[in-house]
């Protein structure tokens, strides 16, 4: 029987325009308000047999607020951004423009001294493919948007450059149905958000 792994994007901890690499900040008031607003649509996922989350404070808080009581999975951590950790993309670009350009152009490169995009996607995909087959049924995982993008690129076997074209919004949900390297994408009830947020 195939698995159904539903990814829920963690609520935000800042304006989406101020997102930082490997952001360890807790949910802000806007994030908490968004969780409360989205909870009617996302609470039913608490019935999943297995409930996981990334180790970030906002992933754990989102999962707890939705009643998932998730188990932290280190493999669902955000991409290791090395010396760019805590910076916005604009800040990294201002400090090291050629390194950022190289990182965006080459998924195998890690000019920041951390993890390459290729290694990050492989790590997240490895977690996805090692879900035990006898755990058939429902799995929910609260994670950072970057982790969900990595899971989608891996599962759908699309070009790595597709990663940059996926826009995973806070508290959106998407499901992957399948197992062992054969996955299908299913869109869940994604909460509409005002444009420009």
Task: Briefly describe each language-model feature range.
Residues 45-75, 101, 177-197:
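Conserved histidine-centered catalytic loops in small-molecule metabolism enzymes
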Residues 53-54, 122, 142-143:
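Short beta-strand scaffold positions
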Residues 145-149, 178:
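GST superfamily/GST-like fold recognition
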Residues 26, 66-125, 165, 187:
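Phosphate-handling substructures
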Residues 2-71, 113:
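Active-site-proximal alpha-helix that buttresses catalytic centers in soluble enzyme cores
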Residues 1-4, 73, 79-91, 153-197:
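Acidic, low-complexity terminal tails and accessory targeting/binding regions
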Residues 36-43, 121, 125-133:
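Generic structural signal for well-ordered alpha-helical scaffold segments
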Residues 5, 49, 135-146:
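Generic beta-sheet signal
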């Amino acid at each position: 029987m195939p698995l159904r792994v539903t990814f829920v994007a963690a609520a935000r901890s800042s304006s989406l325009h101020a997102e930082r690499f490997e952001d360890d900040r807790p949910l802000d008031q806007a994030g908490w308000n968004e969780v409360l607003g989205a909870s009617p649509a996302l609470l039913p996922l608490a019935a999943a047999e297995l409930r996981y989350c990334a180790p970030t404070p906002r992933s754990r808080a989102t999962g707890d607020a939705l009643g998932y009581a998730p188990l932290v999975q280190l493999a669902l951590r955000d991409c290791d951004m090395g010396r760019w950790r805590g910076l916005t993309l604009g800040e990294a670009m201002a400090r090291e423009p050629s390194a950022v350009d190289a990182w965006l152009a080459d998924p195998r490169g890690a000019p920041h001294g951390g993890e390459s995009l290729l290694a990050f996607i492989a790590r997240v995909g490895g977690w996805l493919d090692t879900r035990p087959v006898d755990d058939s049924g429902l799995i929910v995982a609260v994670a950072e948007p970057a982790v969900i993008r990595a899971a989608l690129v891996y599962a759908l076997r699309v070009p790595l450059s597709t990663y940059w074209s996926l826009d995973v919004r806070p508290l959106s949900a998407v499901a992957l149905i399948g197992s062992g390297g054969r996955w299908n994408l299913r869109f869940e009830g994604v909460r509409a958000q005002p444009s420009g947020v």
